[in-house]
Amino acid sequence: MRQALPLVTRQGDRIAIVSGLRTPFARQATAFHGIPAVDLGKMVVGELLARSEIPADAIEQLVFGQVVQMPEAPNIAREIVLGTGMNVHTDAYSVSRACATSFQAVANVAESLMAGTIRAGIAGGADSSSVLPIGVSKALARVLVDVNKARTTRQRLTLFSRLRLRDLLPVPPAVAEYSTGLRMGDTAEQMAKTYGITREQQDALAHRSHQRAAQAWAEGKLAEEVMTTYVPPYKNPFAEDNNIRGTSTLADYAKLRPAFDRKHGSVTAANSTPLTDGAAAVILMTESRAKELGLHPLGYLRSYAFTAIDVWQDMLLGPAWSTPLALERAGLTMADLTLFDMHEAFAAQTLANLQLLGSERFAREVLGRAQATGEVDDAKFNVLGGSIAYGHPFAATGARMITQTLHELRRRGGGFGLVTACAAGGLGAAMVLEAE
């Protein structure tokens, strides 16, 4: 094992995660229908600051992410600063790393803390699949640009006359990889076939995710980390995730047809994460700054790792690549972990990563490592359910996982937890967390 890389400031301070909060997550076109991501971000950051009782001017940086960009608010981070009463001089910028976006936001704030340029910051992300940047065709876009340069009405009419009826149809956001044309579900199908993952195994994991998430809500474990929201017309509160199917049975999952490979596939809407709206954020500080403010951190960021792999085959194996690197940098092994939380983009992707984490052959022949990362103990894995149940507002999922894992670690008396996710473009992320 290589030497561990401690995440500390120049003064030796650990990176403290003081608190975290999220909105409830809502299925597309339900509770947050018509609410843009920037407003979801304002909701969660405003409430996070109010609950923490930290002076607004103590936050020196806000790094926030959004995957489905809105052209009218390209820097969501700055809009959140301006819309929540934070100090107008607060540094703010936006990031995007697909499904690992808030992992990146956390890493960026941590790096600012380690560099000594700030002592406290906020990281998070928000996405809306209900408020989308519906575009126009390339032909219409080109004509509209040319029309702006036309000098006469005749010239403008000539330009418009070149358009066909189909050129006027709206264009929804792309769901396929730009470089390959493959949808993530196509890759999940490929991975299911490559690694022998059956439909029954996928449905069982999805059912497990919903059952555990429903139990977590029933036992009150999520109440502290999920805010109650009010949206226009402000009549009814929205306080719990609305995708969780706590009363479903395995027989219900078996009824659904494959969503991607219609004839021979096994990936369905039920064993995949749904399109979701929501936001999540965490406050990070140097350990000494937290003490100055009289705060007791949820936990600490021990290490992180980002990886990138080929997009044509096994594109969603990011966790199998990033997990051993994050563990190595933390100076830990799989056996040292109390909790292991993996983003469930698809049950097939999740099961493939779990399989390869325990594979000696994959470790030697693909990762170039002497031994497997290690089998993941089911008693430590996604103990409160995962993204298949909660949903997946792309940029918010990482912050949800971090907050949820730290709270659960504290309930168990402390220890180490690892959170990891795959992301579009063959990207992967993993972070090791510590709670006392």
From Swiss-Prot:
- Subunit comment for this entry? Heterotetramer of two alpha chains (FadJ) and two beta chains (FadI).
EC number(s) recorded for this UniProt protein: 2.3.1.16
> One GO BP annotation here?
fatty acid beta-oxidation
Q: What are this entry's molecular-function GO terms?
A: acetyl-CoA C-acyltransferase activity
Q: Which GO cellular component terms, listed alphabetically, does the Swiss-Prot or TrEMBL entry include? A: cytosol
Listed Gene3D superfamilies: 3.40.47.10
NCBIfam families under this entry? Answer: AcCoA-C-Actrans, FadI, PRK08963.1
Q: Which UniProt keywords apply?
A: Acyltransferase, Cytoplasm, Fatty acid metabolism, Lipid degradation, Lipid metabolism, Transferase
**Is Magnesium one of the keywords?**
no
Its function, per the record, reads: Catalyzes the final step of fatty acid oxidation in which acetyl-CoA is released and the CoA ester of a fatty acid two carbons shorter is formed.
Q: Where is the active site?
A: C99 (acyl-thioester intermediate), H392 (proton acceptor), C422 (proton acceptor)
Location in the cell reads: Cytoplasm
Query: Which protein family is it in?
Result: Belongs to the thiolase-like superfamily. Thiolase family.
Q: Which reaction does it catalyse?
A: an acyl-CoA + acetyl-CoA = a 3-oxoacyl-CoA + CoA
Pathway in which this enzyme or protein is active: Lipid metabolism; fatty acid beta-oxidation
Supply the enzyme class, top level.
transferase
Q: Which PANTHER family match?
A: ACETYL-COA ACETYLTRANSFERASE, CYTOSOLIC (PTHR18919:SF107), ACETYL-COA C-ACYLTRANSFERASE (PTHR18919)
Q: What is this protein called?
A: 3-ketoacyl-CoA thiolase
